[in-house]
Amino acid sequence: MTTLGTPLSPSATRVMLLGSGELGKEVLIALQRLGVETIAVDRYENAPGQQVAHHARTITMSDPEQLKALIEAEKPTLVVPEIEAIATPMLQQLEDAGVVRVIPTARAARLTMDREGIRRLAAETLGVPTSPYKFCDSLAELQAAIDAGIGYPCIVKPVMSSSGKGQSKIDGPADVQKAWDYAMAGGRVSHGRVIVEGFIDFDYEITLLTVRAKDAAGAVQTRFCEPIGHVQVSGDYVESWQPHPMAPAALQKAQQIAEAVTSDLGGQGLFGVELFVKGDEVWFSEVSPRPHDTGMVTMATQWQNEFELHARAILGLPVDTSLKSPGASAVIYGGVDATGIAFDGVAEALRVPGSDIRLFGKPESFAKRRMGVALVHAADTGTARRLAKDAASRVKPRKA
C-alpha cells in the first residue's frame, strides 16, 4: 500500500520537478491534489509550474554541481525530469548512490535527453522499425550521408533540441547548407551533432501515451491510452485529437513497439511514444519519459488526463487510461514579443460548445511561443478539431 504524507510537515511526500513549463505545471497540480509537497525547478523565475508549487527554485539544470547541491539540500522523495536539458549523468550518479529516485529512471532520462541515445536503443538494441538514419558532426558528413543512401527528401534535426527547434526538411542539394545552419542554431549545444533521417511517406503520425503503473499485486503493468493524432509544423505541435482511428493490425504493432521501448527504459510513469503509420506498417520516431505536448488533449478526453496518470503512476497508485469523450486541442500562440501580455477574447472562446482553455502564465511572450491551448470535447474528432481551432482563434493576446 502506498502511504502519502501531509505537505509542509515531517511526513510529507516531496516531489521535485526539473522543468516547470506548462506540462510540468499540470503535473504539479495533479500531485498537489494527492497531497504531495512540490518543488518546481526551472532556469528562469516565475515559470508556469513555479506559480503553483509549494517551493520554487531557479538554477541552471544542465550544471551538475548546481543540480547536485539543490537535490542534496531539498532531499526530495522523487525527482521528475520534465525537460531534456538536464545534467543527466549527475542524476545517474545520485540515483546510483541511493540519494534519490529518478522518474522513471536516471538511465531513461539520460537515453531520452538526446535523439542519438534513444534511436540507437530502439533501432540497434531492440530492433524496432525506424526510418533510415545517420548521425553527423559536420556539413560534409551530412552531405556524405545523404549521398550514401539517405537520399532526398530527408529530415535533419539537432541531436539535442526540443519542440521542433532546428528541425527542417531537405528536398534537394540546395537545401543542405541551410538545414545544417538551422540545426546548429536550434540545438541546445553549440557545434552540435545532427541526425539525418530518410523521409517516410507516412499516412499519419500518432502519439501513443503509454503508462507503466503498478497493478493490485504490486507488479508493473503497461497500459495504453487511445491513439492521439496530431499536426506538427517544423516539428512543433499545433493541434491534436483523440482518438485517432487505426486499423487493428497497425494499433497492435504500435502498442508492441511502445511496450518494447518503454519496458527497456523501465521505471514507472507515463511515456509519450511518437510513431509514423502507413497502412499496417508502423515506425518508431521518438519517446519522452513524461507527459507529451500533444497529450494536452487528454484534459478534454480522458477520465484521468496524462498529467494525472503520470502523478498516479510515479506514486504507485492505480490508473485508468480509458476515454471519456472524443476531443481536440489547438495551440494559442503569443502573437507578440512582450512581457506580461494580456489576453482578450477569453469569454468568446469559452462560448464555443464543449470548450475549455488553459493559459499557461508564461511571463514572456514571443510571436510563435505557445502561451495557451484550447480544449474541446465533442461527439466526434472532426467536430472537435473544428471547434478547438475556432476557440483558439478567438483568444487575442496583446501587449498589456
From Swiss-Prot:
Pfam family, one: PurT_C
Residues bound to N(1)-(5-phospho-beta-D-ribosyl)glycinamide: E22, L23, E82, D293, K362, R369, R370
ATP-grasp domain: residues covered: 120-315
Keyword annotations of the record: ATP-binding, Ligase, Magnesium, Metal-binding, Nucleotide-binding, Purine biosynthesis
EC number(s) reported in the record: 6.3.1.21
Top-rank EC class of the record's enzyme: ligase
Keyword Nucleotide-binding: yes
Reaction catalysed by this enzyme: N(1)-(5-phospho-beta-D-ribosyl)glycinamide + formate + ATP = N(2)-formyl-N(1)-(5-phospho-beta-D-ribosyl)glycinamide + ADP + phosphate + H(+)
Role according to the record: Involved in the de novo purine biosynthesis. Catalyzes the transfer of formate to 5-phospho-ribosyl-glycinamide (GAR), producing 5-phospho-ribosyl-N-formylglycinamide (FGAR). Formate is provided by PurU via hydrolysis of 10-formyl-tetrahydrofolate.
Record's protein name: Formate-dependent phosphoribosylglycinamide formyltransferase
Species for this entry: Variovorax paradoxus (strain S110)
GN (gene name): purT
